[in-house]
Amino acid sequence: MLAAAIASFASNLPGWLLAFGMWFLIWTPLVALLEYATHRWIMHMANRLLDPRLDQLKAHVTHHRGSNDDEFVNMPLKNCLLLSSPFLLLLLGGGLLAGSPTSVIIPAAAFLTWSFVYTYLWTVIHRAIHGVEQNWFRRIGPAFRFFRNHHLRHHVHAHGNYGTVFPLTDYVFFTWLGGDVRPRRIVMRRRSKTKRARA
């Protein structure tokens, strides 16, 4: 019986992997929307429904003031799972109502995998952008510069450029901040030199 189950698993593996990959791609817009919504409406607004103690807002304000400690730059897996869990529960509940919870195992696994991948990408990209560590993302040249410039514009003008891993969401929601904007600390440093020169 075990041998038959293993043989069945092995023969169906290519189909399962194809379905997993398809669902991984299908979930991409939802993950991008979750990133955008979280950054815009939880990290930049007092939202006691989704963040009762305003921990995310306070931590993000500290980060925007220049703190690049791990707790302000990294994406905790716990936070990502808290955001994705309602969708996983809806998916599993839908499978139970349809009568076949196994029909949602692959879509749920793909969405859960996206949660892990997203947490990793956010942390790597964000750490590279803020110079916290030299990692593979800093070495990809033009793509790194694009992501860095997009994100640093957000630090100068916090009313746009909310997409860190998915910056194109800012085009979709009309919050793209273009143009040549210097990071705040450089602008502040130059102002202080000008003030000293005048004194």
Regions found by a protein language model. Give the residues of each.
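N-terminal membrane-targeting hydrophobic helices
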Residues: 10-13, 26-27, 33, 88
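Loop-to-helix transition at the N-terminal end of transmembrane alpha-helices
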Residues: 18-28, 46-54
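Membrane-embedded catalytic scaffold of the fatty acid hydroxylase/desaturase
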Residues: 33-192
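Helix-coil boundary and interhelical linker segments in multi-pass alpha-helical membrane proteins
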Residues: 2-23, 93-109
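A membrane-cytosol interface segment of integral membrane proteins
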Residues: 191-199
